[in-house]
Amino acid sequence: MTEQALLTDARLYLCTDARTDRGDFADFVDAAYAGGVDIIQLRDKGLEAAEELELLEVLETAARRHGRLWSVNDRADIASLSGAPVLHVGQKDLPLASARKFLGGEAVIGLSTHSHGQIDAAIAASRGAGGLDYFCVGPVWATPTKPGRAAVGLELVRYAAEAAGKTTAKTTGGAAGPTVDGPRLPWFAIGGIDLGNVEQVAAAGAERIVVVRAITEADDPAAAARSLLAALDAGAS
């Protein structure tokens, strides 16, 4: 499958640090993929570039073994050097146009959003050649991984579901070209999501989720991933 096809089919996205305290990064990411995680992002602000590149090689090996995607947070230079198929940026990180210029048209690029206006802008940025490939909405609930950022609640998840549901595929002939029928722009709910509330997120309209502690703190990452996917299905039914 192409990277875009893998993104379209993705439902469970995991962000993890380097797990330096446990020393089990390779085993952990392999177990997470085995349990059904579709994308794993290495997000660890404390890493030196050389350390991050070394861990990304480990992540790439596991991703290829399972036929899944792997992602770099914030840094287009690291994404380029590592050959990562996915780059995720925040509102204050490298602008989409600059990231696209750096990485080229084949890279999958995602963006964090926290408001109605940012969601609308993300959807608008998906149109045309080199547009945005996916966006995340959150944090739905307060989370220690994003200290100081207020929770946006389920209302913004509902808004994203409605707004993204009105979109079509990327335009032909550049940004000014006519729209064509196709899949909706993929988006993920993120922030404080765990087994206890994932059904609420799904009921609000999210088909895809990003998690951190729900898997990183689990005794059995593979089982945790399977349980989250089952709950995501249950909430949507």
From Swiss-Prot:
Cofactors named for this entry: Mg(2+)
Pfam families on file: TMP-TENI
SUPFAM superfamilies assigned to the protein according to its UniProt record, in alphabetical order: Thiamin phosphate synthase (SSF51391)
Record carries keyword Magnesium: yes
Positions contributing to 2-[(2R,5Z)-2-carboxy-4-methylthiazol-5(2H)-ylidene]ethyl phosphate binding: 143-145, 192
Annotated keywords: Magnesium, Metal-binding, Thiamine biosynthesis, Transferase
Reaction(s) catalysed by this chain's protein: 2-[(2R,5Z)-2-carboxy-4-methylthiazol-5(2H)-ylidene]ethyl phosphate + 4-amino-2-methyl-5-(diphosphooxymethyl)pyrimidine + 2 H(+) = thiamine phosphate + CO2 + diphosphate; 2-(2-carboxy-4-methylthiazol-5-yl)ethyl phosphate + 4-amino-2-methyl-5-(diphosphooxymethyl)pyrimidine + 2 H(+) = thiamine phosphate + CO2 + diphosphate; 4-methyl-5-(2-phosphooxyethyl)-thiazole + 4-amino-2-methyl-5-(diphosphooxymethyl)pyrimidine + H(+) = thiamine phosphate + diphosphate
Binding site for Mg(2+): 74, 93
Function of the protein: Condenses 4-methyl-5-(beta-hydroxyethyl)thiazole monophosphate (THZ-P) and 2-methyl-4-amino-5-hydroxymethyl pyrimidine pyrophosphate (HMP-PP) to form thiamine monophosphate (TMP).
Similarity field: Belongs to the thiamine-phosphate synthase family.
Protein name: Thiamine-phosphate synthase
Species, as recorded: Arthrobacter sp. (strain FB24)
Lineage per the UniProt record: Bacteria, Bacillati, Actinomycetota, Actinomycetes, Micrococcales
Gene: thiE
